[in-house]
Every structure is written in C-alpha cells, then in structure tokens.
Amino acid sequence: MLSPQRALLCNLNHIHLQHVSLGLHLSRRPELQEGPLSTPPPPGDTGGKESRGPCSGTLVDANSNSPAVPCRCCQEHGPGLENRQDPSQEEEGAASPSDPGCSSSLSSCSDLSPDESPVSVYLRDLPGDEDAHPQPSIIPLEQGSPLASAGPGTCSPDSFCCSPDSCSGASSSPDPGLDSNCNALTTCQDVPSPGLEEEDERAEQDLPTSELLEADDGKIDAGKTEPSWKINPIWKIDTEKTKAEWKTTENNNTGWKNNGNVNSSWKSEPEKFDSGWKTNTRITDSGSKTDAGKIDGGWRSDVSEEPVPHRTITSFHELAQKRKRGPGLPLVPQAKKDRSDWLIVFSPDTELPPSGSPGGSSAPPREVTTFKELRSRSRAPAPPVPPRDPPVGWALVPPRPPPPPVPPRRKKNRPGLQPIAEGQSEEGRAVSPAAGEEAPAAKEPGAQAGLEVRSSWSFAGVPGAQRLWMAEAQSGTGQLQEQKKGLLIAVSVSVDKIISHFGAARNLVQKAQLGDSRLSPDVGHLVLTTLCPALHALVADGLKPFRKDLITGQRRSSPWSVVEASVKPGSSTRSLGTLYSQVSRLAPLSSSRSRFHAFILGLLNTKQLELWFSSLQEDAGLLSLLYLPTGFFSLARGGCPSLSTELLLLLQPLSVLTFHLDLLFEHHHHLPLGPPQAPAPPGPPPALQQTMQAMLHFGGRLAQSLRGTSKEAASDPSDSPNLPTPGSWWEQLTQASRVYASGGTEGFPLSRWAPGRHGTAAEEGAQERPLPTDEMAPGRGLWLGRLFGVPGGPAENENGALKSRRPSSWLPPTVSVLALVKRGAPPEMPSPQELEASAPRMVQTHRAVRALCDHTAARPDQLSFRRGEVLRVITTVDEDWLRCGRDGMEGLVPVGYTSLVL
C-alpha cells in the first residue's frame, strides 16, 4: 500500500509516460497526424513505420487500437512484429544531461519527485532473429542520470502500481511483440558495443573497493551456459554517494557480456542500498521463475523469465529531447561530454576516494574534477613539490603580522605527541593519511603519549619567537613545586636532628632531661638554629608584604602577624590563644622574629605544633588575605594538597617527644640568630691621626688666643707640660655654652667629653677657667661671633643680661651657643656653677651628694650606704659611677642613686 504522496507521484509519472509515448508514436507515423482515424498501409509493407496486426484494414486510433474492438495486446496481435525493424533506431542518439542543448533540464519529470531520481521507462526486448543492423547507438547515460531498467519483458508504464503477479502474467503472453499501446518494440542482436563496455568500465572505476560485496550464493560465474537474470532497479543512482548516504554497489560486469556462447547470459550482482533498498535476486534457469525487487516502500521492478539478446534503453530525458527537436531534426551523435556541471553538484561527501576498478580493468583518468577528488587531494600526504599552487592569500611560511589568516599547515609534533593538523575538515582529521603515517612514531618507548601540546607561532610571526606556552607553564609549575619541596626538606632535616638528639636517651627520665632546655641547653640550640628558621621560612613563603589596616592603612606582614591572625577566640584555639598572650607579654622579646621563635617553643612544649599548622591550612579566608597564590600554604590549599600532607607527616614525630623549653632561651643565651654584630671599624691610619691631633691642637690654641692666653701658649710646647689637649678645648667650649651639660652629671663638669681622664678633667678646668674671666678681650669675642654670623648688640640688654624667652616653650630660644661664646661669662653676675668650679681645690672637697635609697655593695670596690646619707664626692669615674667617701671609707657609688647637694 503506497502512501498518498507516493501514489500521487506514481500517477503523475504514469500520465507523463502516456504523453511521451503518444508523442513518440505520432512522430514515427506522420499519416496519423492528419486525423484521429486513418487506414494503415497494406500489410505486406514491412519497411514502413506502420504497425502491423490483426486489425489491418480497419480504422485505428492514435494508439493503433480499433474503437469498436477492445484491444487485447497480449492475445490478438500476430507474431509478425518480431522481425520488424524500427527505423527510428538509426536516428536515435544517446542523450546525456551534459549536452549543450539540454543540460539545463535534466529530466522533464525530475521535479515530480522530491527525494528520488526519475523513474525509467519500461521497455521489453523480444527474442528474435539477428538483425542486420548493428548495435544501436543508444548507450546508458552517465551514472547520475536516470537509466532504463533494461529488464526483459517489463510491463507498460502503469506497472508502477501493479503487482508482481499481474506483471508476470502480462509478461507471459503468447504475443510479446507489442506493448500495451500496440507499439512494436525494436529487437536487436545482443552484441556488446565498445562504447557500452567503456562506459560500464568507467562506472566500475568509480566504485570504492571498500564497498564491494563479498562472494555469496547470489554471485554467478560468467562461464555458465544457462541464462541468468540481473535485476536492474527502476532508476540508477550515481555510484558517488550523496549526503543521504545512498550507497550502491555494483559488480565490475554491469553490462552485457558475450562469453562466446550462442545463448548469452546476464550476469548480476546483488545491489546494496544503505537507505533501505533491498533487491532480492535468485539464479534461475530460462523460463522458470520471476524475481521481484523491493525498492523503498513498495516500488517494484518485475523481471520476465525470457532472456533476450537485445535491450533498448530509453530515459525520460531522451524522450523529452526527441520531442523538443521534432521528428525532422536528426539527433547529433553523442560524444564524450564533460559532466562537471552536474556531477559536482550531485557529488556526495564520501570518506575515501575511489581506489580503482575491482576487476582490474584500467581506464584512462577522468578529466572531471569533483569536490570529492579535491577533498581527497587535500587529505593525501603532500609530495615534496606541491602539485598545485596554494590559493591566493595563503602562505606556506609563518604569517607576518598584517595578514590575519593562518596558513593551514601541519604543526610540528614533538616526539611522543599526537600530530595535530589544522585547516582540514573533521572527517579529514579522522582519516588523514599523514596522521596515520606518523602514528607509529608516537608509540616509541618512553614517550609521553598522553599529552598533546599545541605549538603556535608568535603574534609577531618571528620564527625565533616560537614557544610552547603550555610547556613553559608546566615547567614553571615544576620549578615552583621544587622550591616548595626545598622548604619541606629543611623542615625534615631539622626534625631528624632533634630526633637524633633524643635518641641517646635510654628511658623516659633521660628523655625528659634531654627535652629540658635548663638541663640540656643543646635541645634549645637545636630548635632555635634548625627548626625555628625552617618554619619561619615556610610561614613567610609567599606572604604579602603589607596587610591592610583600618587605622594606619597598611601594616608590614611577618610570620608573627600570621600567628596573630590565626589565633582567634574559640574552643579549638583556646590553648593557642593563651600561648599567644603569654608570648606577647614577654617584654624582652622586642622583634617579631624572636616572638615567632618563642611561639614555636611554646607549641613544642604543649605538643600543638601540628595542630596549629593544620588549623592554619584549613582557614581559606585567612590564606587568601595574607598569602599570594604562589605561596606554600596557597598551593597546599589549592593545586598541591600533597604539600600540606607531607608537612603534617614531618611534624608528627615532634608531638611524641616531651619538651620543656624556656620561652626566653634565645634572649638569655644570645644565640647568633639575628644579624651578626658588625666588627669594630679599624682605626684611622697614623697620618690621619696626626692630622686630626694637629687640627685639634690648633683649635685649642685659637680658643686660648681668644681668651687672652696666647702669651702663655706661645712658649715652647716642651717647656709647658700642662699644654691644653684637644679634650680640654672641647671641655672649655662645653663649659662656656652650658648646653651639653647633663642634668644627671651637673656639678661634675666635662665628664661626658673626657671619660678616660677621671681625676684630671675637673682640676684642669679649675686651673684654666679663671683666666678668661680676668683677661677677656671683648674685641676678640666679638670677632669670633661675627665670624660665625652671630648678631651683635640686640641680643643683650643694657645690664648685659639675656632677653627673656618667648612665652611658648615650644619655640626655640633666641640665643644660640655661638652667641654665648661671643659674649662670654658676664663678670658682674657669675653663675653658681662657675663660682663653684673656680674655687680652689680645698673647696671642691666639700662637694657632696645625698643618697636616695639604700644600697649594699655587690663588689669590694663599691660603697654601701643608706637612704639620706650625705656622701663626699672625690672624683667622677664616668657618667654612671662616682667615687665617694664616707667615714674614712671610699668606693664607687651609682650616679642614679644620688642627688647633688647644693
């Protein structure tokens, strides 16, 4: 049962075939065109174009049928038409869709079928005597055009809708010489024409060898004498398959072959259709059985039992062209035409090009280029010299910066990597011959076949700039991991040293003693010199240099800031918070590094070192806030979790050991963990020392000259043993200014500037100070002040006193040191300090200090005293100690414990 659409198409094709048959019949019989009825010529004239039959002498219509007598084509027509020759064979030529006059219309009814090729006309070849005429020039069309089924004894065009039984019954009529329209069918000797075989061989050349059917029970040997049947479909399809995946496989012998036997046989191979066509063929003897081929939803082709030595192939296209040209125009003999105009359009998309004829027959190469062949050429391995020029705009060299298109060249494949080809279609990549040739190279031992690294030219197009960016990223990641492994190695070495230190213990008591830093300082040294620096570097790795702060804007980050941020109030970190508070209250630990070390010592004491590191790694927000993505803890949290696991495994043995470490061990033992102390700079060379001494001596003489003592200093230096030294000059300058005198050492002049001259500084000052007050030259002092830019008179009042200072104590005073030097000491109002210093030596023995607290001497050279006692000052040792006496006893007294008695 046909669908409505296919039934409509069958009816339309049937009507069209009737019109074509009528037109062909009228073109062969011009006398019938004068009227609807005509008298046929005498029956003896066999060379005419009239039909011959039992209706001779009666009026017939255009179909040679009597209007009074119903036509019984299978019973009443005589056998005389068997030897009748159709003269139209001489003027019929094989038409191809590629003919210049008809290439625009492939078939007059091709638009009736939306998805199939047009149906061929069924004509029946009748057996008869050999005709004197050679094989007609009608040859099968190219494989893309509709062909005649060439089945012997096919039915009339209305067989589209008939059943196999009716067709077989019609084919077994006693008079098979006429068709359903009472038209004589031409007979011809079955002589294979060279053109036919050549065309068949060319058709065979297009068949891919991968689709040939294997030998089965339906395959027939060409040497059999018994006639066999070949079932040709209603229409033929080009062997180059379309997108709908129609696949037709034919044997290499598709035509009529003459094997030297009188009764020629038909040789057939079962044809396979991927889109649902199934043709069932069976080998039968002549006159035995009829085969029916099922074609796509009920379209059938019926085969007669009788093999005939001749076939006439006619297509819709040929009939339409003869009808257009008219009966008077002879057909031009067909030559081999270029069918690229319609072959390219209908060329299917196949995976592989045709690989030659299966039967071994060699045919000349076709000059037609199809899309399939172009695709096959592009997939084939390129020869050393390219067979054709590359398209315009393409380049076989690395592209320059201006042109954006990238050449479709093969990328360089590293050993062991899959080659990647660009510029090809997906199916081309799948079956690329070049890829198949290079595939064995990827299976070499030791090759990394699992990686695919794509290399591309740089944007600048410079060959030297070609880099594997992914390989670089992998190498960078590898270097980063190696760096982190180095941090873990340092931790591992330190842990091994600590464990080896405890390995000397034989019992738990000895282990406890070895873990106590007071009993065994070596463990403290080991922890501070090996483990603490390793953990400090680990925590500081990848740490951001600054941390945002609400008040100061940013604070410098350090491992101790990580400790501060990680210790939060909570149940799990309560003990850690207690330890953090304890370390923070240790005043001697001023640097963040020493505090971090003390925190590590406390973690070892409480066996929480592993706990703190695990809690630090679990806090993702803290890590993102404090660390860069390349830091150790960031990598351990993200891409390399094995780092954190390995760190915890390394620290796990320390949780078993017992430690009693002093948190101030570093402060007490002064370990050289900080920056080493800079060595004392070497002293100046002797020449420089002499120069400096000479300059200082000149300064002393200048001061003496300003104070009127130049006469005394003018004497020979060897004669005066009490020559003022550079220290005495500076002492005099300090005494004159009274600015550099310390409050704690007030009354003990020049103790800061002459620490090595404990007993002689005050004596020399006492001997030299009275001289400037007595013999001071006012002009000399004014000259020195003007030399240094000190203002003159406005700095003094009428009585010589200084002006009062400004009310604000924040403002600088109006008088300077050089102004005091210029003015000198006023003679009418000497200060009490100057009076005390200018007193004779016996007066200085009465200078005393009062004790502020009780003090017990710690050494024999110190003096013990009680609070409130008055001690006699003998001399000043340095800025911290005084030599005092009490009740006939002398000793050292701290300056801070006394106050000066005025």
From Swiss-Prot:
GO terms for cellular component: cytoplasmic vesicle; cytosol; early endosome; Golgi apparatus; microtubule; microtubule cytoskeleton; nucleus; postsynaptic density. Residues 381-390, 398-407 have a biased composition (Pro residues). Residues 291-309 have a biased composition (Basic and acidic residues). Residues 470-605 are annotated as: Interaction with TRAF6. The keyword Cytoplasm applies. Residues 31-67, 81-155, 189-227, 247-450, 706-729, 747-776 are annotated as: Disordered. Signal peptide: none annotated. Changing residue 531 to A: Abrogates nuclear redistribution. Keywords: Cytoplasm, Cytoplasmic vesicle, Cytoskeleton, Endosome, Golgi apparatus, Microtubule, Nucleus, Phosphoprotein, SH3 domain, Synapse, Ubl conjugation. It is found in: Cytoplasm; Nucleus; Cytoplasm, Cytoskeleton; Cytoplasmic vesicle. Residues 94-112, 249-261, 433-450 have a biased composition (Low complexity). Disulfide bonds: none annotated. Gene3D superfamilies: 1.20.58.900, SH3 Domains (2.30.30.40). Its main location: cytoplasm. One of its GO terms (molecular function) is actin binding. The keyword Cell membrane does not apply. It comes from the Eukaryota. Phosphorylated on serine residues following nuclear translocation. Predominantly expressed in brain. Residues 277-289 have a biased composition (Polar residues). One of its GO terms (biological process) is protein polyubiquitination. Associates with the adapter-like complex 4 (AP-4) and may therefore play a role in vesicular trafficking of proteins at the trans-Golgi network. Signaling adapter which plays a role in neuronal differentiation. Involved in regulation of NGF-dependent neurite outgrowth. May play a role in neuronal vesicular trafficking, specifically involving pre-synaptic membrane proteins. Seems to be involved in signaling pathways that are regulated by the prolonged activation of MAPK. Can regulate the polyubiquitination of IKBKG and thus may be involved in regulation of the NF-kappa-B pathway. The RUN domain is necessary for NGF induced nuclear redistribution. Associated component of the adapter-like complex 4 (AP-4). Interacts with IKBKG and TRAF6. Interacts with F-actin, acetylated actin, TUBB3, STX1A, KIF5B and KLC1. This is AP-4 complex accessory subunit RUSC1. It comes from Homo sapiens (Human). The gene is RUSC1.
